Amino acid sequence: GYLALILAMDKKYMEAYGADADKVAAYLPVSGQTVTHFTIRKERGLPNGIPIIDEYAPVNRVRKDTPPVILITGDRNLEMADRWEENALFASVAKNIGNKKVTLHELQGFNHGTVLEPACFLIINYIREH
């Protein structure tokens, strides 16, 4: 999820390989971190559980004009700590800057470890419809 979001929002990563992030039909991250990834925080010796929003945070790179971004998370009461809230923040920031192509789906009854299977049905349906 995190990698899909950072590639979608910060075009420099795909441009380095001659690709345009805006040519991707859609981004469909499942339970992705929208703040700086915990691995980066760990490498920096920062405490776990405290979000960092810096140049490595997809939410800090939200753009107005993107392909569709379909955020999929598990149930906010069952997901990893703050994961649904991070995605809700991402969707809110996108909306506030005028990006109408970001949507958030919360899959009730599923947690971080069980959300992928039902998320695949959403992804398949999206592909079939578009």
What is the predicted function of each stretch?
Residues 65, 70-75:
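Short beta-strand/loop motif that positions the catalytic acidic residue
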Residues 46-52:
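Short, flexible loop segments at the rims of nucleotide/cofactor-binding pockets, characterized by
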